[in-house]
Amino acid sequence: MHVISETLAYGHVPAFIMGSTLVRPSLNATAEENPASETRCLLRVLAGRTVDLPGGGTLHITCTKTYVIIGKYSKPGERLSLARLIGRAMTPGGARTFIILAMKEKRSTTLGYECGTGLHLLAPSMGTFLRTHGLSNRDLCLWRGNIYDMHMQRLMFWENIAQNTTETPCITSTLTCNLTEDSGEAALTTSDRPTLPTLTAQGRPTVSNIRGILKGSPRQQPVCHRVRFAEPTEGVLM
């Protein structure tokens, strides 16, 4: 467990991180006006570290540039929302595990996805999640729909994978993501779901394109591979 003592700069107002508690000497900091900027700054400092959350539990921040899709596809023109994959949070004792996501929007709303229960709203911003809310202020359930990565593979947990193995078992029809605290690697399994072109911040697939690919794609054999999260870089991460 890392005990962090860092100084962040929100404009001209310093902020200090001790554990997972962020203390600011003034409420006029840039973080209050632009939570997305605060989120980028926090992730840049805390990348690769494990911190204690308010109210108990831990958060391991992998700080990737991976985005997942949160949205409905039942009607034409429905918006596809993008969320950034932040890391993995665990309740005290490890009884429950959540994939932590930050919405790609001005406020960087923080969400938690638990396999089997769905998507939970955790905090209005990443700073609020780390300072005061933690996992104890989550709602019962925000949305029960599936969460997909940018290739339209279903996002799920894989709890029983050995961290030191070189071979990864297959699980059909799922994308499994295990965020390991030691190696910073993710074990991914792609399945017979169709693959969309990689999304970027500038371009998103339309609902009609998704329907066409879902309807016309042949079934494929599951393929397993291991990928390493991108190393954090200096400057803006998003």
Curated annotation (Swiss-Prot):
InterPro entries documented for this protein: DUF1314 (IPR010741)
Keyword set includes Transmembrane: no
Annotated disulfide bonds: none
GO terms for cellular component: host cell membrane; membrane
Pfam families tied to this protein: DUF1314
Subcellular location: Host membrane
Membrane topology field: Peripheral membrane protein
Post-translational modification: Phosphorylated by host.
UniProtKB keywords: Host membrane, Membrane, Phosphoprotein
Family per record: Belongs to the varicellovirus ORF2 protein family.
Name of the protein in question: Membrane protein 2
Organism name: Varicella-zoster virus (strain Dumas) (HHV-3)
